[in-house]
Amino acid sequence: MYTITDEAPMLATHSFLPIVKAFSKPANITIETRDISLAGRILANFPEYLKEEQKIGDALTELGQLATAPDANIVKLPNISASVPQLKEAIAELQAQGYAIPNLPEEATTEEEKTIKAKYAKVLGSAVNPVLREGNSDRRAPKAVKNYAKAHPHSMGAWSADSKSHVAHMNEGDFYGTEKSVTVSEAGSFTIEFEGKNGETKILKAASPLKAGEIIDSAVISLSKLKAFIASEIADAKAKNVLFSVHLKATMMKVSDPLLFGAIVEVFFADVFEKYATLFQELGVDTKNGLGDVYAKIAGHPMQAEVEQALTTAMENGPALAMVNSEKGITNLHVPSDVIIDASMPAMIRNSGQMWDAAGKSQDTKAIIPDRSYAGIYQATIDFCKKNGALDPKTMGSVPNVGLMAQKAEEYGSHDKTFQITENGTVKVKDANGTVLMEQAVETGDIFRMCQTKDAPIQDWVKLAVNRARLSNTPAIFWLDENRAHDRQLIEKVTTYLKNHDTTGLDIHIMNPVDATLFSLERIVKGLDTISVSGNVLRDYLTDLFPILEVGTSAKMLSIVPLMNGGGLFETGAGGSAPKHIEQFIEEGYLRWDSLGEFLALGVSYEHLGQVFNNQKALVLSETLDEATEKFLENDKSPARKIGQIDNRGSHFYLAFYWAQALAKQTKDAELKAIFTPIAEELTNNEAKINEELIAAQGKAQNIGGYYHPNFELTEKAMRPSITFNTILAKLN
């Protein structure tokens, strides 16, 4: 099962999937596709608005069910975690293509509007991964990738001991400080209730199931303390003359983080929001969508010039803002989904701890990460680099990750239990008998969040950690903080469940995240590997932080999800869907997306298939694909990022070329050898011609009939421009 997703990986699929299908056919393997793109998920949710021929199935729900089957084998490419502005763009594009879907209601007042808004909420943020991830995560850099990075090290900015770059976080009133956590002894249910100062109660979440042994947490971030913290950090950034930047995860944490982002925008531009409060209310300015929302709503208004000048003045008076795009004047505060912590912090650390200012110059930076829970890992890395200099990709070790994520574990499953509070009072989490399990005092504007972590995934996670430590003969560190309520519950379980496994001769420790970061970095510089065993958020952060420093990108990681019922989910790298790549392709016919993640995932997918179904041909495809990938890296056939040189389509040709050669050379399967020998010969004889045809297609604007929902035929034509290559491939079908 191969997923159709969004942006650059979607384009790449149009070129690579025909190769995969052609090579799989002689091994009696059928590749099916399911469309889980943002547009596909929107259409699947609104069948009642569509004509019969426009309706499509709900592929995500279907794949979610498949993930619980023992024979599941899913190759999952990155997809958009949609912010509200992206969702609106996708809706407008689909409407323009003749799909009569409704608009996203700004304020849902009628029942119909509430239903529409709830349906759209299902496709916002990281809506795909929690559905498919019915297992924990095993992510590591494959040997071929690590060897390539050592031989061809990526650039690393030099560090200075007197760098002023640092992380700033709250010291009170954040999620970390207010967290309460309990382990539920028997199965039951819970409700979340708000009780006002006047004693009136309101149900925030109706009865929902709890499993025996489940860990539940509640935490609050105080809006007033957040705003006071931001105001003091703005003054500090100005005094220290460093860039001001904010690092959140507004895509995945789709309820809490846009609210935090909006509060930060309001404090930074406090004078403007105070002066134009009435106007902004009339215009429906929503700071959850960032500063960009002010510019969008004021456009064409008689007061546009005045408001824009006020914003400019505020920027001139405040500390310099880190920029997303200096040329276009897009700041860190424009769009919540533009700066995503797991990608932005490693990029900053790799760039000497600096971000870009309005003039496009690299400057020392204050990185605001409001909640303390994980901010320390980045500060520890910065401190280490200030003391020891930049890490060296030629010699550094690796930090593979075993991540707890099955069944929406921890914060990444909290969206349906996260609320902004509208008045002072108390939020109570009660069991079915009305007993209060946890309560939190709250004030207007505070964000309350509850998380759940089921016991079976924790047991599976501990088992996976022990297996990886044993198989790779590497120390494994559980990143858990004894001073944090949730982690204390986890430490108890981890300590208990480790006793169920033979850990003789294994080096397994529990450390808080800061100590674990320093321990891992001290080993990295000696060229030693250390497995990080972490919760769901740290899984996300660490599988970007270390790969970006080690191999230059997280897209080259092997990302395996051994599903708890025996199937396999193979994710193609940990990077996103690269919007800048598709923009460049549409403008000038050059796609710089690197499909290495797809090659690696496909290799382990074939291997899993071969082992589960005893399909020897699948095992041969897996082994030869790995050989081809290694040769592909050795010969440097990844996209060159320059028009007139190899791009994504050319890289696919070379992978197919080397794969056919490996299949022709192998001796384990005579039938495959006989089929691929003439194919390898034809590709060898036509190498120059195919390259010419592929490069000739570059340098021109491309019409693929859409961004979120492109036309299949137009995209296929744009992504498969070599008639010679297509003709040779067709012989396998």
Model-assigned labels for residue ranges:
Residues 1-262, 271-493, 497-509, 513-519, ...:
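Extended, well-ordered protein cores
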Residues 664-667:
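Ligand-binding pocket scaffold of soluble enzyme catalytic domains
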Residues 669-672, 696:
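Membrane-interacting alpha-helical segments
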Residues 673-681:
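Short, charged, amphipathic alpha-helical segments
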Residues 689-704, 731-733:
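Extended, solvent-exposed regions of the mature portions of secreted/cell-surface glycoproteins
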Residues 699-720:
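C-terminal, helix-dominated tail/subdomain
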Residues 713-733:
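C-terminal accessory extensions/subdomains outside the catalytic/core fold
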